[in-house]
Each structure stands twice: as C-alpha cells, then as structure tokens.
C-alpha cells in the first residue's frame, strides 16, 4: 500500500465524515472527490460502506450515554420504549422502499442530471422551509426528542424516503422534513443523527453480506485508514453542527447545495468525473 493510496483513502474518509451529517449530500461529494482523486480500487463500493460506518460510529460515541440509557431502560422506562419505537417507525419506510427499488435507483438515478437536480431541489426546499420558519411567530411544536409522537416519527420517516434519490441527502431530508412538520431545529438535527444509526448500520451489514469477499488482508489497512478518518471528521462535524444550529439556520447550506448541483452537472458532462 503506497503513500498516495493512503492519502486518497484519508481524504475520502474526511469528505465522508464532513458531509454525512450536513444537509449537503455525502454521495455527491464522494463521487466528485473520488473521481478527482482517481480513487477507483476494486473494492470502491465496499470502501464507501466502511467510511459510512466510521461516520456513524462518531454519532454513537457522541450520544453513547443516551444510547446506553435507552438500551438499559427498555424493560422498565416508558420514555426509552417510546424513543425506540419512534426510531423504528421513522426507519421502516426508507428501508422498505430501498429494498424494493434498489436496482432502479442505481440504474436510473445515479447520473449527473438526477443528482444535480436533487441537489438544487433540496436547496430550494431548505430555502422554502427556512422562509416559513422566519414567518412563524410561535415556537416550534416539538421542543425535545422525548416529545415526539409516533405520527411525528412517521412523517420524518416518510421525508427520509426522499434521500433514496442520490443527491437529496439523508440528513437534509430528515432535518428539513422534521422542521416542516413542527420539530424545533436542534430537535430535528438530533433526531436525524439517531435515525442514521439503524439506517447506516443496516446498510453496512447488507453491503458486507453481499460483497464480503472484498474484505481481505490487502484491503484491511486501506479500510482502517478511511474508517478512522471518517470517524474523527464526523465527530468534529457533529459537535460543530449542534453548536451551529443553536444560533443559525440552514440557508447557507441551501445556497451551497444549489451551487454544488450546478457544479456536478458541469463536471458530469464535461467528462471530468466518472459515474459508475
């Protein structure tokens, strides 16, 4: 394993960690970054799964006390059971649709135009929702995660289905969807973090089972570098985002998405990046 390959794995791990939990689409960024870096190992798809796993481990570490409290409280605490039920309810719709339409999504939507359109449409949706937030005089209806109802969770779960379209962003769909349905900005952000845990863990197990032969002695070092880079950068990003949403809205991310969407369209049809 040469130093150039190590640096490329490190860079892609950082890109994943910085974009997985921001409403900007980690998929689009990984495609562009991977192509510019000419990072196309045989295990590229498995590498993407590994660095996603590293990113979600950062959320698990950040919320380790809450997760432990929920797990240990399931037998006796109503709040723990309701929290778990809400996460399950919000997870089911996207998982069901992903299993049904996986091949169609990869064959039809994994191209410059759909990804660019999704980025721009997602940016416009953020601007619209933030505009509604500014016009409202009353506070958001849901001020804490524990106040979420199963119906609230279902609505956020349906919003998460939009993330099956490459470029829409899972975090963007759940955060902005949550805000649209009455969740306070920080509550929507934290619930999005928790929803990522079963979704990404499930995707990791599914893809690993499909392509377990990619995990061999030659690839372990590369995977480990990407995983650690994604973990560290995601941990820093999650902490930063929680501070950011306390006093800022998501308008800046909306304009960034729109600009990045146009950039993806440009480089996609210029031949600068490869769509595989």
From Swiss-Prot:
Catalytic activity: di-trans,octa-cis-undecaprenyl diphosphate + H2O = di-trans,octa-cis-undecaprenyl phosphate + phosphate + H(+)
Principal cellular location given in the protein's record: membrane
A Gene Ontology term for the protein's cellular component: plasma membrane
GO molecular function terms listed in the Swiss-Prot or TrEMBL record: undecaprenyl-diphosphatase activity
Keyword Hydrolase on entry: yes
Organism: Burkholderia mallei (strain ATCC 23344)
Pfam families, per database record: BacA (PF02673)
InterPro entries: UppP
Gene responsible for this protein: uppP
The name this protein goes by in its record: Undecaprenyl-diphosphatase
Membrane topology: Multi-pass membrane protein
Keywords: Antibiotic resistance, Cell inner membrane, Cell membrane, Cell shape, Cell wall biogenesis/degradation, Hydrolase, Membrane, Peptidoglycan synthesis, Transmembrane, Transmembrane helix
